From Swiss-Prot:
It comes from Azospirillum brasilense. Residues 445-620 are annotated as: Adenylyl-sulfate kinase. Residues 1-444 are annotated as: Sulfate adenylyltransferase. This is Bifunctional enzyme NodQ. PROSITE patterns: G_TR_2. The gene is nodQ.
Length: 620
C-alpha cells in the first residue's frame, strides 16, 4: 500500500467502552475508503456467515479482530494495529479493547498515539469505561480527540441525543487538557459519516471521520525544535579501538564538534563522530538512529541521556508521577519494584499515594492502595538519580513502567509530573570511617540474618540463641525483634498490608545502618511478603543478606500459640493475623531452612552459626 503524500503520518487509536463498535468502525472505514483487498473482503464474507445480514453479509469487525478468541466472542482483547494510507495522509490505527480488564492494553496503544477516536454508543451515552479511557488518553499525552457517537441509526431524535452527549463530554473533559475535541455522529454499521457524508443526518454540518483524520493537526513525528535529547540504548564496542553510544535522537539535532552533556552524571564532551549504517555523517536529525563517539573518556552507558549545553533535563531520585495500575495485586506504598525509564533499570519505591482519581467525577480522593486499572498521583523514590523531562514535555523521557521483581510482569505505567524539590537539597555525607574499617576492628563481616516464618514458629527463640552463641565467640551483634520494634519505632503502624510493608521497609533501613556500623544484625520478623524481604536484600551488598526460613507448619504454630494470638484470631477478635486471615508468602530459595519439628532450638541455632562460618561472616 502506497504512502500518503499529504500531511504525513498520523498515529491514532480507537477506544471506548465494550460493544461501542470500535472494530466495526475501523473495518467500515477501511472498506469504504477502498483500502481492503479482494481476498480480505472475500475472507470476511465467509467468516461473517450467520453474523451479518447487510452490506453483502460482511461483519466489518472481522477486518480488524485478529485473535481467534476475539472472533469467537465478538470482542477485542489485544490491541490490533493497521497501517493504511489515502492520497492525503498515511495512518497507523490501534484498535484498543473496551473491556475494563484490558485497560492496560488500551494504555499501551495510547502511549504511541497522538489522536484518540473515542466511541460512544448513542443509546447508552458516556459510561464509566468511556470516562476511564478519556482519562488514560489524557494521561498518556493525547491532546486531540474525536468523539465518535456511534449507532445513531438506533436512536430517535438523533440530533438531540447527539447534542446531549457532546455537551456531557465537553463538561467532563474540561479538566483533561485536550486541545481539540471534534464530535461526529455516525453509524459504523451503515457507513454514515465514516467516509461519506450521511443523508440520514442532514443536521450535521461537520466533517466525516476520514475527512477529519486527513486534516487533523496532530502530528507525532520527532521535532528538531525541541531541546537535544539522545537516549543511549546500548554501548557499541565492536573492537578495542571503538566505543560508540547507539540510540535514537528523540528531539533536537546533533553535529560533529557539538557540545553535549551526559546525564545523570552531568559530565560534558563533544561529538567526535556520528556513525550510521551508510557511513559517517556530520549531522543527525530528530528521529535518526545513529551511533556517536565522544572526544573525551566520559562515563556514559546504556540508559543515559545526552543533551545540549542548553535545556538540560531534570535529574532527581524523587519525583511525583501519575500511575496507571495494571496488576491484580494492588499497589501498596512502600513496596519496592523495578523501574524502567527508556533503557535504564533502577530499583524504585512508591513512597506515597497522594490521591486516587475518581473516573466518574475526576475528583481526587484519599486512598491507601491503588487497584487494577485505577489511576493515582504518587511520589516515587529511586535507588539512583534519573534524568527525565515532565511527561507533558516529552513522552519519551517522561514515562516509565514498574515491573514486579518476582514475576517480571509490568504492573504500572507512569507519567512523571515533576521532581520533588526536597530531594535536590539532600546530599549523602561521606563518612570518615568506612564500613570495612569498622568491620575489621570487630573481626567480622557485617550482614543481616533475617529469620522469617509464621507467628509461633520459633524465630525469636532461635535468633536469641544464635546471638548468644555469637556473643560468646566475641562477635558484635544486634537483635531486632518484631514486637520490640512495634513498641517503639513502628508503634504508629497497624497490621494492614500497607502497614506491614512500611514496617519491613523501616526495619530494613535500620538494619542497613547497623551493618554500616560493622554489626551482624539478626532480624526476627514474620515479614509475610516476599517482595519486602527481597527489597531489604536489595539494600545490601551481595552476600550480606541471609534469609533463614523457620519452616514450622501452621497446625504446629496453632498448637503452640505461645501468646494466645491464634485463639484470638480464630475467635474473630484479632483481625489481619498472618496464617489465619492474612497471607504468608514462604521463601522460594532461602539461604537456610529450619524445621523446628525435627530438631530443637539449640541444634538449629548451631546450624545458623555454621552458615555464618561458611559464608565468612563470623570467624569460627
Amino acid at each position: 500500500m502506497e504512502t500518503g503524500t499529504g500531511r504525513g503520518l498520523l498515529r491514532f487509536l480507537t477506544c471506548g467502552s465494550v460493544d461501542d463498535g470500535k472494530s466495526t468502525l475501523i473495518g467500515r472505514l477501511l472498506h469504504d475508503a477502498g483500502l481492503i483487498s479482494d481476498d480480505q473482503l472475500e475472507q470476511a464474507r465467509r467468516d461473517s456467515r450467520g453474523r451479518a445480514e447487510e452490506d453483502g453479509g460482511i461483519d466489518f469487525s472481522l477486518l480488524v479482530d485478529g485473535l481467534e478468541a476475539e472472533r469467537e466472542q465478538s470482542i477485542t482483547i489485544d490491541v490490533a494495529y493497521r497501517y493504511f494510507a489515502t492520497d492525503r495522509r498515511s495512518f497507523i490505527v490501534a484498535d484498543a479493547p473496551g473491556h475494563e480488564q484490558y485497560t492496560r492494553n488500551m494504555a499501551t496503544a495510547a502511549s504511541g498515539a497522538s489522536l484518540a477516536v473515542l466511541l460512544v454508543d448513542a443509546r447508552k451515552g458516556l459510561l464509566t469505561q468511556t470516562r476511564r479511557h478519556a482519562i488514560v488518553a489524557s494521561l498518556m499525552g493525547i491532546r486531540h480527540v474525536v468523539l465518535a457517537v456511534n449507532k445513531m441509526d438506533l436512536v430517535e431524535d438523533g440530533e438531540t441525543v447527539f447534542a446531549a452527549i457532546r455537551q456531557a463530554f465537553t463538561v467532563f473533559s474540561a479538566p483533561l487538557g485536550f486541545r481539540s475535541v471534534t464530535a461526529i455522529p455516525l453509524s459504523a454499521r451503515h457507513g454514515d459519516n465514516v467516509v461519506h457524508r450521511s443523508a440520514a443526518m442532514p443536521w450535521h454540518h461537520g466533517p466525516t471521520l476520514l475527512g477529519h483524520l486527513e486534516t487533523a493537526a496532530a502530528e507525532d513525528d520527532p521535532t528538531e525544535d525541541g531541546p537535544l535529547r539522545f537516549l543511549v540504548e546500548w554501548v557499541n564496542r565492536p573492537n578495542l579501538d571503538f566505543r560508540g553510544l547507539s540510540g535514537t535522537l528523540l528531539s533536537g539535532s546533533l553535529e560533529t564538534g557539538g557540545a553535549v552533556t551526559v546525564w545523570p552524571s552531568g559530565r560534558s564532551a563533544r561529538i567526535a563522530r556520528i556513525v550510521t549504517f551508510d557511513g559517517d555523517v556530520t549531522q543527525a536529525r530528530a528521529g535518526d538512529a545513529v551511533t556517536v563517539t565522544l572526544d573525551a573518556a566520559v562515563d556514559a552507558g546504556r540508559g543515559d541521556l545526552l543533551s545540549g549545553p542548553d535545556g538540560a533535563p531534570e535529574v532527581a531520585d524523587q519525583f511525583a508521577a501519575h500511575l496507571l495500575w495494571m496488576a491484580e495485586e494492588p499497589l501498596i506504598p512502600g513496596r519496592s519494584y523495578l523501574l524502567r525509564a527508556g533503557a535504564r533499570w533502577v530499583p524504585a519505591t512508591v513512597t506515597a499515594l497522594r490521591h486516587a482519581v475518581n473516573v466518574e467525577t475526576l475528583e481526587h480522593g484519599a486512598a491507601s492502595v491503588l487497584g487494577l486499572n485505577a489511576v493515582g498521583l504518587c511520589n516515587l523514590s529511586t535507588a539512583a538519580p534519573l534524568a527525565f523531562d515532565p511527561y507533558e514535555a516529552s513522552r519519551h523521557t517522561g514515562s516509565f513502567i514498574l515491573v514486579d521483581r518476582f514475576s517480571n510482569r509490568t504492573v504500572g505505567a507512569g507519567m512523571i509530573r515533576h521532581p520533588l524539590r526536597r530531594a535536590a537539597n539532600l546530599h549523602r555525607q561521606e563518612l570518615a570511617v568506612s564500613t570495612v574499617e569498622r568491620a575489621a576492628l570487630k573481626r567480622q563481616r557485617p550482614a543481616v540474618l533475617w529469620f522469617t516464618g509464621l507467628s509461633g514458629s520459633g524465630k525469636s527463640t532461635i535468633a536469641n540463641r544464635v546471638e548468644r552463641r555469637l556473643h560468646t565467640l566475641g562477635h558484635h551483634t544486634m537483635m531486632l525483634d518484631g514486637d520490640n520494634v512495634r513498641l517503639g519505632l513502628n508503634r504508629d503502624l497497624g497490621f494492614t498490608d500497607a502497614d506491614r510493608v512500611e514496617n519491613i521497609r523501616r526495619v530494613g533501613e535500620v538494619a542497613k545502618l547497623m551493618t554500616e556500623a560493622g554489626l551482624i544484625v539478626l532480624c526476627a520478623f514474620i515479614a509475610p511478603f516476599r517482595a519486602e524481604r527481597e527489597a531489604v536484600r536489595a539494600l545490601l551488598p551481595d552476600g550480606a543478606f541471609l534469609e533463614v526460613f523457620v519452616d514450622t507448619p501452621l497446625d504446629e504454630c496453632m498448637r503452640r500459640d505461645p501468646k494466645g494470638l491464634y485463639a484470638k484470631a480464630r475467635a474473630g477478635t484479632l483481625r489481619n493475623f498472618t496464617g489465619v486471615d492474612s497471607p504468608y508468602e514462604a521463601p522460594d530459595a532461602p539461604e537456610l531452612r529450619l524445621d523446628t519439628t525435627a530438631e530443637d532450638a539449640d541444634a538449629l541455632a548451631e546450624r545458623v552459626v555454621e552458615l555464618l562460618h561458611r559464608k565468612g561472616i563470623a570467624e569460627a
